Amino acid sequence: MAVVARTAEQMRQWATTLLDALGGEQRAQAALPFADDGARRWLEYRPLSRPGACVAEASPAARKAAHRLLSTALSDHGYAQAAVIMALEEVLDRREGWWRGRHSDDYWVSVFGDPAGHSAWSWRFEGHHLSVTMTVQDEEISPAPIFLGANPAAVRFGDRPVSRPLGPEEDLGRELLQSLDAEQRAAATVGGSAPYDIRSGTRPRAPESLQPLGIAAGALDATQRALLDELLTLYVGRLSPGLG
């Protein structure tokens, strides 16, 4: 708990620093009531505008404070993944012919409630393929929802990867799948193709049952279970120590 308490204090510090560094209009955009469920439960991983202050329009001091706030929620490798995901906006813009005007600072930050007060408050850092929300109550933190994606998933020089921010997740997932025998794979395979998008989309509540599908962890052998545990640890390990 001491680790989480320190993280909560760091979040308070950098959320306050961020708000102080923002100008009047941007501060009004970023500082929102905790009771505003519509804005607080917002989830949008597509490249669209959203509630909050845009990092691209902030001063250098405010941009740095926004990144310091984001870094309080993430581990070293989690923050590295987030930073590369944001940088890939420039690569994607080039691949699309620059017509869309994507920018690596087109991310928005919001603070809900008063981080210097004694009531629950939360913050969100969000943009294309990146959404991180943390809710803080005293010395406790609820680290959800959090989403990391990547486009392009990989940039290569021939067969050599130049950038592949979510490569470990993909590699471990495929390694686990390849380890399954025919019967296990039949149980684990729940569709012939991947879903078009995230099942719950951008809705704050899932519209359908999230009844678990696939193969139970208890049906895996020791080697397969170790791969599953490593994969889960990788995902949970995106968070700062004590939050997973």
Annotated model-derived regions:
Residues 37-214:
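Acidic/His-rich structured neighborhood in mature extracellular/periplasmic domains
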Residues 30-32, 188-190, 229-230:
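Short hydrophobic alpha-helical segments that form membrane-spanning helices or hydrophobic packing faces
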Residues 11-18, 26, 62-65, 169-176, ...:
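Stable alpha-helical elements in mature extracytoplasmic
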Residues 1-61:
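N-terminal mature-domain "stem" immediately C-terminal to a signal peptide or N-terminal signal-anchor/transmembrane
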Residues 215-244:
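Extended, compositionally biased non-globular segments
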Residues 30-34, 82-86, 244:
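Short, tandemly repeated low-complexity microdomains enriched for cysteine and small residues
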